[in-house]
Amino acid sequence: MLDSLKQKKNFQRIKMRIKTGDLVKVINGKEKGKTGEVLKTIPLENRVVVKGINLRTKHVKPTQEGETGRILTEEASLHASNVMFFSKEKNLTSKIEYFIDKEGVKKRRLKKTGEVID
């Protein structure tokens, strides 16, 4: 999988500062303006899966005799550049920056407000 990604002409891995469990807002695409929690990050592909966003329907055929087919709805991935961290307290989106606090621990904070995330 990694080899196939490297073979793509303009493949560039971006630095993803979004982690699983973060609340994000979609800033581009058909789901623009919606917010949701990050379920999964795929750093090698620069993609994230967000709960309740970019839903796809999948038709599953019956695999055994007597079983009925069904329609599943699941979240598809979004490119990481199309989402931005969302702060519930301040009700705004912001970029994330890393910093080292007084104890020498690396933490994340919002660039706009300086609010420490973790």
Curated annotation (Swiss-Prot):
Keyword Aminoacyl-tRNA synthetase in annotation: no
Keyword RNA-binding assigned: yes
InterPro entries: KOW, Rib_uL2_dom2, Ribosomal_uL24, Ribosomal_uL24_CS, Ribosomal_uL24_KOW, Translation_prot_SH3-like_sf
Molecular function, one GO term: structural constituent of ribosome
Pfam families in the cross-refs: KOW (PF00467), ribosomal_L24 (PF17136)
Gene Ontology biological process terms, A to Z: translation
Coiled coil: none
Keyword terms, alphabetized: Ribonucleoprotein, Ribosomal protein, RNA-binding, rRNA-binding
One GO cellular component term: ribonucleoprotein complex
Family statement drawn from the similarity comment of this UniProt entry: Belongs to the universal ribosomal protein uL24 family.
Function field: One of two assembly initiator proteins, it binds directly to the 5'-end of the 23S rRNA, where it nucleates assembly of the 50S subunit. One of the proteins that surrounds the polypeptide exit tunnel on the outside of the subunit.
Self-association and partners: Part of the 50S ribosomal subunit.
Name assigned to this protein: Large ribosomal subunit protein uL24
